[in-house]
């Protein structure tokens, strides 16, 4: 191959991005959602978020959901009970895409001291912002969004517009 061809391939490879896929379960019942307090993760420790895990190699998103439900929430779910609620692309440079999934039924009951049920209209103030935004977007019927909203300038644009978060405590 010519040197020019090698350069073109190298340039193309440089622009490829490795994507981290997060799978986030929205376990809801009677207007409440199960949230876990993060601990020992190195990011957002002490903040609440729904049960979350990363897509593993050779695993489907639904298989990840089943694994996360068991490992993070202590419940068993069936593939047929999992539905797509929202997809969020992080445009801050982290290379993350999050699939927020609703689960229509499960077996078992989560009893860990780091988890609590919260009313969707009364979420904790110390909740990870991306989850709060995704829940708001899902409630408004949006199925896809970027985070931060509108890219890195999003929070300032939202404040300037007088935006109010429907899920704020």
Regions found by a protein language model. Give the residues of each.
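Short hydrophobic/aromatic beta-strand or adjacent loop that forms the aromatic wall/cage
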Residues: 20-24, 96-100, 132
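Residue-level preference for beta-strand/loop junctions
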Residues: 17-19, 44, 95
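Nudix hydrolase/Nudix homology domain
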Residues: 45, 113-169
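Conserved hydrophobic/aromatic beta-strand scaffold that supports enzyme active sites
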Residues: 35, 100-102, 115-117
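Conserved Nudix-box catalytic region and its N-terminal flanking loop in Nudix hydrolases
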Residues: 32-71
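Active-site segment of metal-dependent pyrophosphate-handling enzymes
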Residues: 74-109
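Acidic, metal-coordinating catalytic segment for phosphate/diphosphate chemistry
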Residues: 1-24
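A cytosolic small-molecule/anion-sensing beta-strand core signal
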Residues: 29
């Amino acid at each position: 191959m010519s040197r020019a061809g090698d350069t073109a391939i190298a340039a193309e490879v440089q622009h490829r991005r490795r994507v981290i896929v997060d799978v986030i379960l929205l376990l809801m019942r009677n207007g409440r959602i199960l949230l876990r307090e993060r601990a020992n993760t190195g990011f957002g420790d002490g903040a609440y978020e729904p049960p979350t895990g990363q897509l593993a190699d050779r695993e489907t998103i639904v298989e990840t959901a089943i694994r996360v439900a068991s490992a993070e929430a202590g419940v068993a779910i069936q593939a047929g009970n999992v539905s797509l609620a929202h997809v969020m692309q992080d445009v801050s440079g982290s290379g993350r895409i999050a699939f927020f999934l609703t689960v229509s039924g499960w077996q078992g009951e989560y009893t860990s001291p780091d988890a609590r049920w919260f009313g969707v209209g009364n979420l904790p103030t110390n909740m990870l912002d991306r989850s709060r935004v995704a829940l708001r977007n899902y409630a408004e019927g949006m199925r896809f969004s970027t985070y931060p909203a509108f890219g890195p300038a999003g929070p300032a644009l939202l404040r300037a517009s007088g935006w109010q978060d429907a899920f704020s405590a």
